[in-house]
């Protein structure tokens, strides 16, 4: 079977966040880009976490109920992030996505520099295109 690699189907321009960004700004980025999650990066483009729409929504609802100060991205981001490499197999990633919860995976190089993201939708598109091509290599 032809090797479908992550780098061929990943989003090279994902929505990204910084740890000091306020949640309102993160929400606005989600609304503008219509993406459901994104990597949190430091000033050197190193992956340090991941923020989802759900994380932001949960905090914003809590803020309404308790009239609290909105948090920063660093307060909400997940620090233990599942990542993939650009040379990883899309098929294997699809199988991993069926077992694990993340719908979006950051794509990083061997030094953990962010290269992009790949979503469940990207994986579905890759497999669909492959099947429609009649397995031609």
Regions found by a protein language model. Name each.
Residues 3-8, 22, 26-27, 40-49, ...:
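Short charge-dense sequence patches
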Residues 17-34, 41, 83-101, 108, ...:
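The conserved cystathionine-beta-synthase
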Residues 30-33, 38-54, 97, 105-122:
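A glycine-centered beta-loop-beta connector
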Residues 16, 20, 46, 66-67:
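A generic helix-loop boundary/linker signal
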Residues 1-13, 52-83, 89-98, 114, ...:
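Tandem CBS (Bateman) regulatory domains
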């Amino acid at each position: 079977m032809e090797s479908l690699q992550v780098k061929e189907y990943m989003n090279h321009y994902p929505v990204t966040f910084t740890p000091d960004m306020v949640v309102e700004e993160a929400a606005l980025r989600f609304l503008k880009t219509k993406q459901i999650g994104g990597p949190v990066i430091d000033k050197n483009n190193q992956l340090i976490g991941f923020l989802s729409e759900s994380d932001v929504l949960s905090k914003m609802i809590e803020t309404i109920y308790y009239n609290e100060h909105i948090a920063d991205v660093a307060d909400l981001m997940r620090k233990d992030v599942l990542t993939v490499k650009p040379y990883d197999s899309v098929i294997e990633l699809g199988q991993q996505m069926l077992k694990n919860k993340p719908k979006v995976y950051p794509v990083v190089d061997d030094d953990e520099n962010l290269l992009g993201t790949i979503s469940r939708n990207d994986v579905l598109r890759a497999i669909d295109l492959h099947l429609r091509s009649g397995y031609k290599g």
